[in-house]
């Protein structure tokens, strides 16, 4: 957000700011962690609240970036997703369906996961490595609503996502298998 604020301070520049939601696809390492757990038959969730998520497949982000490069006279911010929202269980459901698996679904207590995130941060700072789970990432995971409206991107950039979550999960799993990540 600070970079966006600084960019907007130079109002004579043309710019397009892209804000993608949960980006997934080949080579992604963040959401891959969940893919890997589900592939092992484990479907963990943090807490037990209702959540809405938006996702976007990586090639759709690339498409939006190219469209933004050629946008004329813009000084706008665009939210990016596949244009839909999903409940917290949809990603796991689609991974299971695509892999034809059954899983054990369970909910971890929020305070337990917070404790793990704090320990992970401390350990990572000693090792001088990035933590897989930290308190900032946990805050993102705990957000009740990650849904975003992409109507500005549709009209301003002529953005039309090609992949919904089902198609994107299928392509992602093919890549993970072909490259021996799963």
Which positions does each model-derived feature cover?
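Active-site Tyr-X1-5-Lys
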Residues: 1-16
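Substrate-positioning beta->alpha
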Residues: 2-3, 28-33, 47-69, 75-76
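Flexible, glycine-rich beta-alpha linker
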Residues: 13-33
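C-terminal beta-strand-loop-alpha-helix "lid" module of Rossmann-like NAD(P)-dependent dehydrogenases
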Residues: 35-38
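Residue-level signal for the nucleotide or nucleotide-sugar donor/cofactor binding architecture
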Residues: 53-59, 86, 148, 163
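Conserved C-terminal active-site "lid" loop/helix of NAD(P)H-dependent oxidoreductases
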Residues: 58, 93, 118-159
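Mid/C-terminal beta-alpha module of Rossmann-like enzyme folds, strongest
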Residues: 68-132, 166, 170-171
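Amphipathic terminal alpha-helices
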Residues: 148-156, 160-182
């Amino acid at each position: 957000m600070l970079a966006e604020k600084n960019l907007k301070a130079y109002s004579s520049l043309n710019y397009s700011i892209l804000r993608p939601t949960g980006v997934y696809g080949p080579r992604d390492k963040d959401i891959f962690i969940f893919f890997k757990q589900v592939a092992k038959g484990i479907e963990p969730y943090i807490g037990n609240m209702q959540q809405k998520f938006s996702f976007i497949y990586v090639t759709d982000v690339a498409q939006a970036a190219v469209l933004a490069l050629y946008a004329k006279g813009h000084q706008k911010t665009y939210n990016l997703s596949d244009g839909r929202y999903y409940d917290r269980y949809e990603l796991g459901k689609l991974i299971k369906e695509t892999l034809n698996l059954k899983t054990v679904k369970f909910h971890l207590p929020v305070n337990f996961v917070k404790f793990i995130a704090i320990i992970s941060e401390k350990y990572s700072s000693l090792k001088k490595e990035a933590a897989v789970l930290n308190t900032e990432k946990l805050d993102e995971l705990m957000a009740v609503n990650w849904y975003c409206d992409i109507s500005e991107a549709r009209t301003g950039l002529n953005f039309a996502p090609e992949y919904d979550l089902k198609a994107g999960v299928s392509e992602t799993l093919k890549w993970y298998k072909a490259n021996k990540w799963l």
